[in-house]
């Protein structure tokens, strides 16, 4: 089963494709970044959706896991992120019919055992769980991988119908 993990953002969107095999574990297939240029909001959203579309067309994706919007102090930032999330949700629903959402707290808890972990602790566990060497940059990619791992753990524990 291939899981697409997505860390949506208005400037960069991290994505990761994780192959989940219940017997052999997880293997990272691909991870990358969709960079969004400074343009009008409408063009940024279009560029974002086109980037996701390209990933979906180039890979056989079975399930999608998305990191939920975190709390931001700036209401304009929340509104902008919500617009990106709405476009992403529509695209995934049109192509696959369903997706799963995980809060940053759920992701941190799934990978490190507690919800107060910092980004470096999450990055360490991502590398350890997948047997990766070197640093994964930027953190948007690490977060996308972490979301995909969280989803695979939920499947393994029987918490999600497949």
Swiss-Prot record:
The active site is at residues 7, 67, 140. Binds 2 Mg(2+) ion per subunit. Keywords: Cytoplasm, DNA damage, DNA recombination, DNA repair, DNA-binding, Endonuclease, Hydrolase, Magnesium, Metal-binding, Nuclease. Its cofactor is Mg(2+). Mg(2+) 1 binds at residues 7, 140. It is found in: Cytoplasm. GO terms for molecular function: crossover junction DNA endonuclease activity; DNA binding; magnesium ion binding. It catalyses: Endonucleolytic cleavage at a junction such as a reciprocal single-stranded crossover between two homologous DNA duplexes (Holliday junction). The RuvA-RuvB-RuvC complex processes Holliday junction (HJ) DNA during genetic recombination and DNA repair. Endonuclease that resolves HJ intermediates. Cleaves cruciform DNA by making single-stranded nicks across the HJ at symmetrical positions within the homologous arms, yielding a 5'-phosphate and a 3'-hydroxyl group; requires a central core of homology in the junction. The consensus cleavage sequence is 5'-(A/T)TT(C/G)-3'. Cleavage occurs on the 3'-side of the TT dinucleotide at the point of strand exchange. Belongs to the RuvC family. This is Crossover junction endodeoxyribonuclease RuvC. The gene is ruvC.
């Amino acid at each position: 089963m291939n899981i697409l993990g997505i860390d949506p953002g208005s400037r960069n969107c991290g994505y990761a494709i994780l192959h989940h095999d219940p017997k052999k574990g997880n293997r990272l297939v691909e991870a990358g970044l969709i960079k969004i240029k400074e343009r009008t909001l409408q063009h940024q959203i279009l560029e974002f959706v086109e980037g996701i579309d390209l990933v979906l067309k180039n890979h056989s994706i079975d399930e999608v896991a998305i990191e939920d919007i975190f709390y931001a102090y700036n209401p304009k930032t929340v509104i902008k992120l919500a617009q990106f999330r709405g476009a992403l949700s529509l695209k995934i629903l049109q192509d696959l019919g369903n997706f799963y959402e995980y809060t940053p707290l759920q992701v941190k808890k799934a990978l490190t055992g507690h919800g107060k972990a910092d980004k470096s602790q999450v990055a360490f566990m991502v590398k350890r769980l997948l047997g990766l060497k070197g640093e994964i940059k930027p953190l948007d990619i690490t977060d996308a991988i972490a979301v995909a791992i969280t989803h695979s753990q939920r499947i393994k524990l029987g918490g999600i119908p497949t």
